[in-house]
UniProtKB/Swiss-Prot annotation:
Pathway: Metabolic intermediate biosynthesis; chorismate biosynthesis; chorismate from D-erythrose 4-phosphate and phosphoenolpyruvate: step 2/7. GO terms for cellular component: cytoplasm. The gene is aroB. This is 3-dehydroquinate synthase. The lineage of its organism: Bacteria, Pseudomonadati, Pseudomonadota, Gammaproteobacteria, Moraxellales. The keyword Calcium does not apply. Binds 1 divalent metal cation per subunit. Can use either Co(2+) or Zn(2+). Catalyzes the conversion of 3-deoxy-D-arabino-heptulosonate 7-phosphate (DAHP) to dehydroquinate (DHQ). One of its GO terms (biological process) is amino acid biosynthetic process. PANTHER family: 3-DEHYDROQUINATE SYNTHASE, 3-DEHYDROQUINATE SYNTHASE, CHLOROPLASTIC.
Length: 360
């Protein structure tokens, strides 16, 4: 087992990464009250819920559960209310813990519920997908979608602890595994060319679910995110770099309908668009764009999206949270392994990059 820490002063917390982790031993120091609400979904609960429920009950905790439907399209205010209903019906109080057992949707919703319930209760992350292990479970961003934009309602709510168990990735559908690899590739492109080389050498093993390689990829990804979050928790500066590919990707997700494409699939094509625009601006070479596309394709991810009317695409981009004083800011590549956030780009070139990476 490997351990990382997100350094946030008094709110410092560990990320435990390994295979067949012992929840009783690892969770005991971080469950402060007697009441635990496990939030999961209909896919994950039959696989792992009893394991965590029994571990917590053996610690003398009162455990209740809230099982939600599975999918991004349920990340809305109606289903968030189901978590509040469960907490209130169980009679839970301000020293309870909300434990997220699932992927990014469950983590986002359970975290947001924990931030809101009685103005804030304890929160624990047990991410069961690769995407949530390397990205959404670390850093405290929580929230739900609104019909007009993704993640428009939310709060920063740091967990007490994160448990990333590689064994849980064995039950992950191939498409979900690939979606997680998109976020892994993102870390390499935005800040670590050595990691990109490592991914190029080991992508076949990652796709084949080699546990040691997956653990290394999760560790390196989380180390990048932990460092950035420690420096910029509320996304005032450097943390925005973690949105490489996301402004384009969120537009794709929003237009196609939440859940039609997985988040990681949209981010993958979004990173291709960002690389394409970076090349059009003269910052990276055609070879760099080709290299970006190749590693994304080797992870079984899309490098283009279905045709989306340009006005619709731009309309969704205008709702992006990185818009500042009415100006869209994008995360682009100065070179592979070095990203910048900028408002200094030619909008016509951006339109060309969007249109060039769509298919009929």
């Amino acid at each position: 087992m490997q351990t990382l820490h997100v350094e946030l002063g008094e709110r410092r917390y560990p990320i435990f990464i390994g295979s067949q982790l012992d929840p009783k031993q690892l969770l005991e120091p971080y469950i402060h009250g007697q009441q635990v609400m496990i939030v999961s979904n209909v896919t994950v609960a039959p696989l792992y819920l009893s394991h965590y429920q029994e571990a917590l009950e053996s610690l003398g905790k009162t455990v209740a559960t809230c099982i939600l439907p599975d999918g991004e399209k349920y990340k809305d205010i109606q289903h968030l209310n189901l978590i509040f209903d469960a907490l209130l019906e169980a009679g839970f109080n301000r020293d309870c813990t909300v434990l997220a057992l699932g992927g990014g949707v469950i983590g986002d919703m359970a975290g947001f519920a924990s931030a809101c319930f009685q103005r804030g209760v304890y929160f624990v992350q047990v991410p069961t997908t690769l995407l949530s292990q390397v990205d959404s479970s670390v850093g405290g961003k929580t929230g739900i979608n609104h019909p007009l934009g993704k993640n428009m309602l939310g709060a920063f709510q740091q967990p007490q602890v994160v448990l990333a168990d590689m064994a849980q990735l064995n039950t992950l559908p191939e498409r979900e595994l690939s979606a997680g690899l998109a976020e892994v590739i993102k870390y390499a492109l935005l800040g670590d060319e050595d990691f990109l080389v490592w991914l190029e050498e080991n992508m076949d093993g990652l796709v084949a679910r080699d546990a040691d390689l997956l653990a290394e990829a999760v560790y390196r990804s989380c180390a990048h995110k932990a460092r950035i979050v420690a420096n910029d928790e509320k996304e005032q500066g450097e943390r925005a770099l973690l949105n490489l590919g996301h402004t384009f990707g969120h537009a794709i997700e929003s237009y196609l309908g939440y859940g039609t494409w997985l988040h990681g699939e949209a981010v993958a094509t979004g990173m291709v668009m960002a690389a394409d625009l970076s090349q059009r601006l003269g910052w990276i070479s055609n070879e760099d764009v080709a290299r970006t596309k190749k590693i994304i394709q080797r992870a079984n991810l899309p490098i283009s999206c279905p045709q989306i009317p340009l006005d619709d695409f731009l309309g969704y981009m205008a709702h992006d949270k990185k818009v500042l004083n009415g100006q869209l800011r994008l995360v682009l590549l100065k070179q592979l392994g070095q990203a910048v956030i900028t408002k200094n780009f030619d909008v016509e070139l951006m339109k060309q990059a969007i249109l060039a990476n769509q298919h009929g």
